[in-house]
């Protein structure tokens, strides 16, 4: 069965001889909680999707690292010469180290960004769990969120966790919006604790 979250087919109970369900959409949050799904769930992994995400993540990390917005949005039309630190001096944390997070981390490391990876589950070489999340957030000049939306990740970045970020940190969220508590994020932006999101 090829699955779409907007399809009328949401009850898999009658399909006892089905070998599997293929999800072709970004995100699996709607189907993973489906109690009638007993068949194996497959998801599409396309190198082009990964490449596109890596380009987005690297592009936006460089945009903020180099301070491009101050040059693009310059109402005074005055050239403000600034010298950003080297990439090796701007730590990036990636929450979610699946295929997209791992590929993004590799590309950022190739540019000499120090990258900390965090995963909800224990994986070799990565931070994990609540203590690991606190450590990962505390060093993130740039935070990239690439986690799926699940009950465990919804509002993962609440006021307490946003407060762990260094002052002026940038949050890039190409993943799911529900990972961040919107009210807490707006308060952190208004207070100047988060520099950009």
Predicted feature locations:
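Glycine/Thr-rich phosphate-binding loops of Rossmann-like dinucleotide-binding domains
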Residues: 10-12, 31, 102-103, 153, ...
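NAD(P)-binding Rossmann-fold cofactor-contacting core
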Residues: 110-126
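Gly/Ala-rich phosphate-binding loop of Rossmann-like dinucleotide-binding domains
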Residues: 105, 109, 189
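Rossmann-like adenosine-cofactor binding region
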Residues: 121-197
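Glycine-rich NAD(P)-binding loop of Rossmann-like domains
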Residues: 70-103
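Phosphate/diphosphate ligand-binding glycine-rich loop within oxidoreductases
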Residues: 2-72
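Phosphate-coordination loops involved in phosphoryl transfer and adenosine-cofactor binding
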Residues: 38, 88-92, 168
């Amino acid at each position: 069965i090829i699955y779409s979250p907007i399809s009328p087919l949401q009850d898999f109970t009658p399909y006892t001889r089905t070998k599997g369900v293929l999800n072709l959409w970004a995100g699996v949050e709607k189907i993973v909680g489906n109690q009638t799904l007993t068949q194996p769930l497959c998801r599409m992994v396309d190198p082009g999707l990964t490449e596109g995400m890596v380009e987005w993540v690297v592009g936006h990390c460089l945009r903020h690292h180099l301070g491009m917005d101050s040059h693009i949005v310059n109402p005074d039309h005055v050239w403000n010469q600034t010298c950003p630190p080297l990439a090796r001096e701007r730590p990036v944390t990636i929450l979610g180290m699946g295929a997209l997070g791992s590929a993004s981390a590799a590309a950022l490391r190739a540019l000499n960004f120090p990258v900390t990876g965090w995963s909800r589950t224990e994986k070799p070489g990565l931070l994990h769990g609540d203590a690991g999340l606190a450590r990962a957030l505390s060093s993130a000049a740039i935070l990239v969120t690439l986690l799926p939306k699940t009950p465990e990740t919804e509002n993962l970045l609440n006021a307490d966790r946003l407060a762990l970020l260094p002052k002026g940190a940038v949050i890039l969220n190409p993943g799911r919006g529900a990972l961040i508590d919107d009210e807490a994020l707006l308060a952190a932006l208004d207070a100047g604790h988060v520099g950009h999101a």
